[in-house]
């Protein structure tokens, strides 16, 4: 019987989250944590996860709309992943992309990345309501990505073909706790702030745009001191947007006192945890030792991983 295996990576946001929803650029990278989707031909369709069943229906509907039909033999879907869920690492984008490619492949449809993006975007919207598309573009393309959503119908990205300078050490992720809110909730929170304080919010978005541009240059040129300062400033703006809770802020201040910098990585969270923090320090071992002492969850990552792919 036919079996299809597809995988997609998680992602990090160097800078630009939330502002990217409003037409500002985001700088992202795929990481070496992946989700695997396996579709197997079977005599009877079987999907145990209700959320996955709903997502499958959304993507199937998009495929039917595009290709005017959806005829297949019965199949089962299984998922395995080492991307933490609900921590800002793009698990929903990775799942939407991998499931889309797996279904298209199972149906014998071979299409380009633009079509895969458009179909998978309906799945990402199922999770987040009005996603920018940046996470999805990154997990499909892989590597480092510069992304900007001009309009719903115009999403522009550039695959950055450089690697971080040799002076730049290892980024790590430290878990500040799982957010109580969904990414959709946090996007709505920023939307309400923009309505209540449009000038303040726009100024923060403008600042994030300049810092995001600086981040690209700093990673390319290898200026560690300026990189740390850039991360700090970007994080302060995110705090002013109201997407970083006290728990995460306290941990970030400790990391700064140790000589490093940290920021949320995605939608964030306010009431409890804010998900995985993207952390940088010239002496990463110092941070690892601190995290070990405090029993904090740490993920070591490699930046610039391969994007969406068929594994079997």
What are these model-predicted stretches?
Residues 2-15, 20-21, 28, 36-71, ...:
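C-terminal nucleotide
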Residues 11, 93-97, 134:
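Short alpha-helical patches at coil-to-helix transitions and adjacent helical residues
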Residues 114-116:
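Short, charged, amphipathic alpha-helices and their helix-cap/turn boundaries
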Residues 73-85:
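Glycine/charged-rich beta-loop-alpha catalytic/anionic-binding loops adjacent to active sites
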Residues 87-110, 143:
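DPxDG-like acidic metal-binding loop motif
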């Amino acid at each position: 019987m036919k079996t299809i295996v597809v995988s997609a990576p998680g992602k990090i946001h160097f800078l630009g989250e939330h502002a990217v929803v409003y037409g500002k650029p985001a700088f992202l990278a795929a990481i070496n944590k992946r989700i695997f989707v396996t579709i197997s031909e079977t005599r009877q369709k079987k999907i145990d996860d209700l959320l996955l069943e709903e997502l499958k229906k959304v993507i199937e509907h998009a495929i039917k709309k595009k290709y005017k039909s959806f005829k297949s033999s019965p199949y089962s879907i299984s998922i395995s992943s080492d991307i933490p869920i609900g921590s800002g690492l793009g698990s929903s984008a990775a799942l939407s992309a991998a499931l889309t490619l797996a279904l298209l492949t199972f149906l014998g449809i071979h299409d380009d990345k633009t079509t895969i993006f458009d179909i998978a975007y309906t799945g990402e919207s199922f999770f987040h309501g009005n996603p920018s598309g940046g996470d999805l573009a990154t997990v499909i393309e892989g590597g480092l990505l510069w992304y900007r959503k001009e309009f719903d119908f115009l999403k522009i990205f550039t695959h950055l073909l450089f690697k971080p300078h040799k002076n730049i050490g290892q980024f790590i992720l430290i878990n500040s706790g799982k957010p109580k809110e969904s990414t959709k909730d946090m996007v709505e929170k920023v939307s309400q702030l923009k309505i209540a304080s449009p000038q303040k919010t726009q100024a923060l978005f403008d600042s994030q745009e300049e810092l995001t541009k600086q981040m690209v240059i700093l990673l390319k040129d290898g200026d560690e001191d300026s990189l740390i300062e850039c991360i700090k400033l970007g994080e302060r703006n995110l705090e002013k947007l109201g997407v970083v809770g006290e728990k995460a802020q306290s941990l970030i201040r400790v990391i700064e006192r140790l000589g490093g910098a940290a920021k949320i990585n995605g939608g964030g969270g306010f009431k409890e945890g804010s998900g995985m923090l993207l952390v940088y320090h010239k002496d990463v071992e110092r941070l690892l030792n601190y995290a070990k002492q405090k029993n904090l969850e740490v993920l070591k990552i490699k930046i610039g991983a391969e994007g969406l792919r068929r594994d079997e």
